Amino acid sequence: MQAVSAIVRDKRGRVLSVGKNSYTKTHPLQARAAQEAGEPYKVYLHAEIDALIRVRNPDKAHTIHVYRYDKAGNPVKAAPCKICQRVIREWNLQVFHT
């Protein structure tokens, strides 16, 4: 299992929320976005969507940072999938990833 994390920040760089991927939890936003992206079977929470649903004040969200780590804990290349890209575009956020 690879660990993926996402951090949503405001314009000043303050952390608004942190999310991580889950192989057991889902959310209606994840299910809707997966359906719209043509991948309805990808219903388990992605880190980006987990971070977004945890933001208390969406109007302050400015950027999202995405990180992925291998089994040894080393950072590896990460980028939002097409499901998460759709939601990030809806939120009009800047994206930074490893």
PLM regions with names:
Residues 1-98:
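Zinc-dependent deaminase catalytic domain
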